[in-house]
Amino acid sequence: MTTVSVQIPAGWPATEERARAVQDELRARVVLDEPGPPPGTGRVTGVDVAYDDERDVVAAAAVVLDAGTLAVVAEATAVGRISFPYVPGLLAFREIPTVLAALEALPCPPGLVVCDGYGLAHPRRFGLASHLGVLTGLPTIGVAKNPFTFTHDDPDTPRGSTSPLLAGAEEVGRAVRTRDGVKPVFVSVGHRVGLGNACAHTLALTPAYRLPETTRRADALCRAALRDAAYRA
């Protein structure tokens, strides 16, 4: 496995005003009219981050799985300084430099990227999954643990049931039941994937647990990378 060190990029937004301007600029480049790769084919990659705010350190992990078997194909981590303060709606600016570095360190193309967070299900319709997709050109989806500020009806009890995730009358994602009777996850399009396909990918990635295998493995790996960084320090 490769671990890389990350520097905050020159010109990276340092203020909320500048970050929102970047979101406005990049949001117009989100592609919503592609279905995306078929579920269960090719590769699928989970990305996640872990923070040590006291030491101003963030660790990111990218774990590539075979989409058909869910076996690990490759993995990489990156460790760097936190690149932006904690501001709801702007969390991508804290995460993207290290996530990009982890993706770039992979020895193979990642295929579909699954983010632990949001894409269009975001107050400005440009969450981490959309931001990462636009910057990389990769198909991306967001699978979140909570509905953020949006509303939804509870899906039916069986696995595979869904209900719209709504901002008023606008559907920004779906609540997807991945285990019978267990709290749903919240799926949204990031870039170059349709919402129905994003939900199908999510179900293909959750054969045994509520959260996708991509998220589970990336979460464990980024936490280990953060512990290792603390040990080395």
UniProtKB/Swiss-Prot annotation:
Taxonomically, which superkingdom? Bacteria
Marked site, Interaction with target DNA, at Y86
| Compartment list | Cytoplasm
For this UniProt record, give its keywords in alphabetical order, as a comma-separated list: Cytoplasm, DNA damage, DNA repair, Endonuclease, Hydrolase, Magnesium, Metal-binding, Nuclease
Cite a single GO MF annotation: deoxyribonuclease V activity
What transmembrane ranges does the database entry give? none
- Binding positions for Mg(2+) per the UniProt entry: D48, D116
Q: Any idea what job this protein has?
A: DNA repair enzyme involved in the repair of deaminated bases. Selectively cleaves double-stranded DNA at the second phosphodiester bond 3' to a deoxyinosine leaving behind the intact lesion on the nicked DNA.
Query: Mind telling me what this protein is named?
Result: Endonuclease V
